[in-house]
Curated annotation (Swiss-Prot):
GO terms for biological process: protein transport; transmembrane transport. It comes from Pseudomonas putida (Arthrobacter siderocapsulatus). Residues 71-91, 129-148 have a biased composition (Low complexity). This is Protein TonB. Its main location: membrane. It is found in: Cell inner membrane. One of its GO terms (molecular function) is energy transducer activity.
């Protein structure tokens, strides 16, 4: 019994000792404070930005278009009476003088046989025919007399075939055309061309169609012909007053 008490007392002391150790350990655990970590502020981040591009220069202001210069309307020229046609008469070329043949040389005289008598040998007769005199040039006076009587005939004849273009009449176009044409001895128009335009293509075409339709003019006098033809330059008037 005593031994049992002694063991019980020993076990009780050991239990008390173990409990005391655990109590001390619990107290130390509770009083132990873990140092809190100090949070440092985040480091400042330096970001280097590229410089902004320079703004593009503004485009130059567009120049305002200049208004077109006002077109001055020129008044229509006053039509004057058509001048009389000029007829070109070429002067006939002067005939060239034929070269004269060389004069025959005289043969030397034979030696004299006797002093009292002399023998003279005549030169042989020349076989060259006598030179013909140049033909007289045609008289200019006769041409000038025949010119006034014929110069208006081609113009009057061609005027019968003249047509005023309808589009030119509507647009009020007027003008004077100068027509150059060559006529043979029979009055046939050999060639023609404009010597001076009126400034209107329609009137120019009408003049060329006029002489193309006519084809012929009155026969010219023979004394006006040069190598069988005569050249005429004549004006043709297109006027709204005359139609």
């Amino acid at each position: 019994m005593t031994k049992t008490r002694h063991n019980l007392a020993r076990y009780s002391g050991s239990l008390a000792l173990v409990l005391g150790v655990h109590a001390v350990a619990v107290l130390l655990t509770l009083n132990w404070s873990v140092p809190q970590a100090i949070e440092l502020p985040p480091a400042a981040m330096m970001v280097e930005l590229a410089p902004l591009p320079e703004p593009a220069p503004p485009p130059p202001p567009k120049a305002a278009p200049q208004p077109p210069a006002p077109v001055e309307e020129l008044p229509l020229p006053k039509l004057v009476e058509a001048p009389k046609p000029k007829i070109a008469i070429a002067k006939p070329p002067k005939p060239k003088a034929k070269p004269q043949p060389p004069k025959p040389e005289k043969k030397p005289e034979p030696p004299k046989e006797a002093p009292p008598t002399e023998e003279v040998v005549d030169a042989p007769p020349s076989n060259t025919p006598p030179q013909k005199s140049a033909a007289p040039a045609p008289s200019i006076a006769s041409n000038s007399n025949a010119l006034p009587t014929w110069q208006s005939d081609p113009v009057r004849h061609l005027a019968k075939y003249k047509r005023y273009p309808e589009d030119a009449r509507r647009r009020g176009l007027q003008g004077i055309n100068r027509l150059r044409f060559v006529v043979d001895a029979e009055g046939k128009v050999v060639s023609y061309a404009m010597a001076g335009g009126s400034g209107s293509a329609a009137l120019d075409r009408a003049t060329l169609e006029m002489i193309r339709r006519a084809g012929t003019v009155p026969k010219p006098p023979p004394e006006l012909l040069n190598n069988g033809t005569i050249e005429v330059v004549a004006p043709f008037v297109y006027s709204l007053d005359r139609r």
